[in-house]
């Protein structure tokens, strides 16, 4: 696939993004994402794992610490991201490469699993990427934020500022991957943990860490957890902040 599939503006934005790096914040978020990966794939063992869109390598850092797989690899579209990954000196990381966003520089069935964590919402041509990932790995694990809400189109600037150009619900993501010939193996919904919310509010946004503000964060988390637990799968998906799904490749895309 040609480099032209990824817009020059998108490439430049991510180069700049990782240059303005906040390691403490990214490590905190990555710890919970890595926990989701481990939990959803707990019934499987993987020897050779590739993370596509590996960012600064924070997820791989935790997966290495937890002995998730003996051999890890990373692909990232930004030079600054690659530099951050290399600087972490992750023991089980066998290779780090910059790539064009769509072409995976490995032969067919090279990996037991590919991880795509909080990447798909940024991808301009999502189906092209999914087909390439299916070529290279037996399993694919995707995590996306559940950004879609009623009136999401009125908040375009908010989401575009984060680079989120695709909106997903658990249902819409399942439809996407199954229509591309993947089989759903395991999945889970998750909420933003209060630890992450507190850091974002009081460190990133520099809000006052008042008792009321802390209580509100904790109450919202517990209330959403309770509603999801009591209301079944539909309510769990309604209140979720993120969705993680493990897929295996099954067949090629079939239309008509």
Predicted regions and their residues:
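Short, glycine-/aromatic-enriched active-site segment of Class I SAM-dependent methyltransferases
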Residues: 143-166
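A short beta-strand submotif of the Rossmann-like class I SAM-dependent methyltransferase core
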Residues: 113-119
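Conserved N-terminal segment of class I S-adenosyl-L-methionine
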Residues: 1-107, 113, 130, 163, ...
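A short glycine-rich, Lys/Arg-flanked "PGG" loop and its adjoining helix->strand segment in the class I
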Residues: 127-142
């Amino acid at each position: 696939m040609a480099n032209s599939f990824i817009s020059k503006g998108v490439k430049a934005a991510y180069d700049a993004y990782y240059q303005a790096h906040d390691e403490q914040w990214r490590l905190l978020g990555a710890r919970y994402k890595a926990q989701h990966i481990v939990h959803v794939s707990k019934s499987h063992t993987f020897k050779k794992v590739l993370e596509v869109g590996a960012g600064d390598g924070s997820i791989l850092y935790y997966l290495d610490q937890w002995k998730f797989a003996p051999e890890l690899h990373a692909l990232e579209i930004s030079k600054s991201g690659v530099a951050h990954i290399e600087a972490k000196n992750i023991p089980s990381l066998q290779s780090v490469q910059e790539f064009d966003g769509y072409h995976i520089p490995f032969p067919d069935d090279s990996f037991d699993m590919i991880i795509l964590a909080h990447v798909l919402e940024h991808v301009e041509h999502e189906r092209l990427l999914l087909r390439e990932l299916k070529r290279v790995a037996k399993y694919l694990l995707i995590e996306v934020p559940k950004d879609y809400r009623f009136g999401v189109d009125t908040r375009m600037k908010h989401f575009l500022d984060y680079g989120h150009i695709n909106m997903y619900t658990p249902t819409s993501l399942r439809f996407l991957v199954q229509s591309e010939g993947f089989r759903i193996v395991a999945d889970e919904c998750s909420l933003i943990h209060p630890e992450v919310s507190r850091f974002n509010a009081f460190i990133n946004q520099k809000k006052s860490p008042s008792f009321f503000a802390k209580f509100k964060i904790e109450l919202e988390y517990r209330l959403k957890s309770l509603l999801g637990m009591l209301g079944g799968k539909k309510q769990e998906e309604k209140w979720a902040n993120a969705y993680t799904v493990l897929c295996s490749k099954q067949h090629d895309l079939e239309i008509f």
